[in-house]
Amino acid sequence: MNEKTAKQIENLKKQTIGVEIEMNHITRERAAKLAADHFGTGRYEYTASRNGYSTWSAWDAQNREWKFQKDVSIAGCDAEKCELVTPILKYEDIETLQELVRKLRKAGAISHAGIGAGVHIHIGANEHTPQTLRNLANLMASHERLIADALKIDQGRMNRYCRTVNPQFIEQLNRKKPANMAQFADIWYTANGANYGRNQHYNDSRYHMLNYHATFTKGTIEFRLFQFDKPTAEKKNGLHAGQLKSYIQLCLVLSEMAKGLRTASPKPQQTENPKFAMRTWLIRLGLVGEEFATARTFLTRNLDGDAAFRFGR
């Protein structure tokens, strides 16, 4: 590993993280109690009067609030429509989150696109500029199809809740080259036909794989494209701690890469060997070494082609 990559990995771990996991087959109260027991605090409460969304909350040893909220987009009975919303996390908290996910799975919780459940990951945007956000948008535009195939993103979700980058947004962004965040926001909302209610939570511009509405309202970059595998007779699936960590690592490295680039192109990458294209891209992003081996596996396993040779053996 060269010095530049090592520094990049060091920096990506300094970013803040927020995760939302939609699931069912578990009540919000039970999930909150399970979390409170997992944290060793035993503290969980019904907090809907403050948080809305029929929320139950659990607190960890650092007094951080983990919310379990009702999300009507999830299939199933209302009592078991459950969305985990984490507090602001750091890289070292990922293991704690993974352990909680494992316990939720053992308790019967299920999450996959077949029940309308996805995974949203937020990365703190405080160190980003209009140029680095433009870089990130171009990185996503040039690799979204590859990522969608790698994750086998449900087409229904792509049509509604996690659309690809709007071509009009990319065209205007790269033509106008916004110098400040106000100009960037104007391009984002007008190009996406959502110039109304910019401060409203459910502004329609949010329903993209890369959601900058969160940037302007919450100070985070939201990646809305993730999902867990649907359970089969052979594998329980539905929630997977290793898969979740892989998704978080991808978001962190994309955000950090965007900060280090002078410019980025929205032009789509080669597609004759998707597995090779993804593997080499992940390496360029900095997902190298044993620490990111699981991420490389999850992000290439569904793609066709030869990971080692672009034109085959």
Placement of each model-derived feature along the sequence:
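C-terminal accessory/tail domains of diverse enzymes
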Residues: 1-113, 126-313
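Short, conserved phosphate-binding/catalytic loop or strand-edge motifs used
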Residues: 115-119, 123
